[in-house]
């Protein structure tokens, strides 16, 4: 008898020889579909899914992605000493609009492009020996350099190498606000490059903070590419018209489930892409890994255990009040560090062999208190 592929719940089964058998994929119905209003559910099934969703409502613990850095005021007072190592002008917005219109008019199911990739005139090589360090009152040291990409809402940095010695931490910081996010490369550095987390602003500082006694000289890296983010998908959805209903206006049982619906940012050869995803209940109550379900076309081309290296996940981007102003996608809590691609299958989701679904496991915990959404293998009724 075939055993369920536990990391993927019950929607995929292992074949007789241990391989995943896509032809035996069971359609998974999850809460994000319901929030989209695409299905009519009988009351008994609604109660079942709602109850399963609430199983994941416990706080699971994580630090906020953005934080005010305690040494920011000291660094800001010496802003003139932070060198601008890369300064790129604003891209031609008319060209971007034309490209986006062509993408979005295609019949093929696709993702929303929110950013472009920009090559640098030359790779910027840096090391602890070449950076200018400032000692703080507590005996620690900071060093920084600045990158500008004209009219960017935010950026991500692409590195071919980033060596962080013990006691040294890198931060991606909005130069105008001091809001920072940790930039922690994986132990196994991906090829051909690794993308750091996104940060709001058209001028971003890469800041290094070294504890007293840390071997600063061992720090090194190579910045080779910039992801220039020029669209906010949440703001655009708000402006799209009455066809987009504010989820914060929904009544129970949906209101308690909104926090389990997230955004997903990824990078491929065409630029920075945005999709939605769902944080779902795990059947493994011992491990309780943070699992995310999304469409396969959102992450296609990223396969294997470490194939979802550049993904980041955005949470709590819903409006705080019915028809209120949405927050910027670049300022909400997020989960960085990539994810593991557990299983997936292509297809249109409407016809053919595949149902266009992918299961991911986050490498870092999402913020505390998010609802883990229920799911069922029951077929939904037509409607």
Where are these regions (language model features)?
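Serine endopeptidase catalytic core focused on the charge-relay Asp
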Residues: 198-383
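Extended extracellular/luminal ectodomain segments enriched in beta-structured repeat modules
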Residues: 149-156
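Solvent-exposed serine/threonine-rich low-complexity stretches and specific carbohydrate-binding patches
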Residues: 180-189
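N-terminal secretory signal peptides that target proteins for export/translocation
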Residues: 1-24
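Bacterial N-terminal signal peptides
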Residues: 28-37
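Short, surface-exposed beta-strand/strand-loop-strand elements in extracellular ectodomains
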Residues: 164-178
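Protease-domain processing segments flanking chymotrypsin-fold serine proteases, especially trypsin-like
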Residues: 41-146, 189-198, 202-282, 286
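Solvent-exposed strand-to-loop "edge" motifs in beta-rich extracellular domains
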Residues: 160-162
